[in-house]
């Protein structure tokens, strides 16, 4: 993925409340149920940083996130890097109330080129991952609780 690429986006509307959606994307215990089961801690606070490992197809990817902006129940933004690999991105989550439901729009913008010739760093893999997380996994998690 290159910084000249347009952002990867995913969006979904959920039958839940803003507070429930905010909690699902900012509470580590809840994030483990739909997002990354190895994330051990998370705080929606500017400057908070977490590193956790994710294994994919026998390869270990140490995820490093740093929160750069958090507006309660409205906006969450963090940098996303993989320790040991070139490249960086910013993940932005925008929440909004839509009648009796709430919407989430996610944007993943590459800010430094991912240069490793791995399938996990291809745009299609990233698009598929965000589609799965936002449109399937989070939706199922929120609407079954």
Which residues make up each language-model segment?
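Hydrophobic ligand-binding cavity/cleft-lining segments
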Residues: 1-41, 45
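Short, charged low-complexity linear motifs
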Residues: 7-8, 19-20, 63-66, 106-118
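Hydrophobic pocket/interface hotspot
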Residues: 21-22, 31, 50-52, 67, ...
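ATP/adenylate-binding site constellation spanning eukaryotic-like Ser/Thr protein kinases
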Residues: 36, 47, 72, 135
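Hydrophobic-ligand binding "helix-grip"
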Residues: 41, 56-103, 109-112
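Juxtamembrane/interface motifs at transmembrane-helix termini
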Residues: 41-44, 52-54, 123-126
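A conserved amphipathic terminal alpha-helix motif
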Residues: 110-145
